[in-house]
């Protein structure tokens, strides 16, 4: 999924780790909200385990999303690899100017639950109307790539060691600045990973010591 729009300013908030639920994210928004989307990363344990993830925004009701493992076909659920979930929520109508608190939870503590249920991250992207003026253009590419070296998918050998996203910037003039934010959930021990923009390496190599 890709969203493209023009607005005044964008803000990104997140909590990262590999934490037992519930996991909370608190942040302040200074201006009027125009668009917001929240993402929750969940570790399933295996592609066979099922369960659910829930998101509560500003003391509202919990929005639960069922997780069906390798059989998942929900539009807002991206599951890859050995049960790595990335779940998206439209939170435009729920976040507000001022202080916000989001709480993510899973079925980890339910009786007879098999889903691992630990949470990789809770991330919210907010586009606001900045009264100070100016105009920005945004591309938000949404998905979950299972990057890996030599491996197996069932009995089929596989390799998927790169993913490419293209942003159509032709015709844009007068660019004064640009920013790129990438969320990286998991890797294999000892495997170096890189982030390139127009062939230029723009990130430090991620190692086991940087988690």
Task: Show where each model-derived region lies.
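Disulfide-rich extracellular domains of secreted proteins
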Residues: 1-211
